[in-house]
Amino acid sequence: MKVTDVKIRKINGESRLRGVSSITFENQFVVNDIRIIEGERGIFIAMPSRKTSKGNFRDIAHPINSETRQLIENCIKTKYQDLLDNPPQEEDFSQNSEN
């Protein structure tokens, strides 16, 4: 399975949540809301989940084997690190109105 796109929305704040990611496979299937979390031993990836009526969390989508999990984690962590190392330039839309 080939990863064809990874998008990350960086989140600034006091919580351990550092960002939210979407990953696309072979331009045909996307998994949204993958959380990027700062843990005690560094960044880790949490697959999208929902809270059950019993208060437990259950993954909505997740990899079946360790190779696929590693592929997803590596792609997201690499893209996240690239975002930290090369933040997007903010465009200045203000107009200088000197007459």
From Swiss-Prot:
Record-linked InterPro entries: SpoVG, SpoVG_sf
SUPFAM superfamilies, A to Z: SpoVG-like
NCBIfam families associated with the record: PRK13259.1
Biological function: Could be involved in septation.
Chain's gene name: spoVG
Protein name, UniProt field: Putative septation protein SpoVG
Keywords for the protein's UniProt record, in alphabetical order: Cell cycle, Cell division, Septation
Pfam families: SpoVG (PF04026)
Family: Belongs to the SpoVG family.
Keyword Cell division: yes
Signal peptide limits: none
GO terms under biological process: division septum assembly; sporulation resulting in formation of a cellular spore
Annotated S-S bridges: none
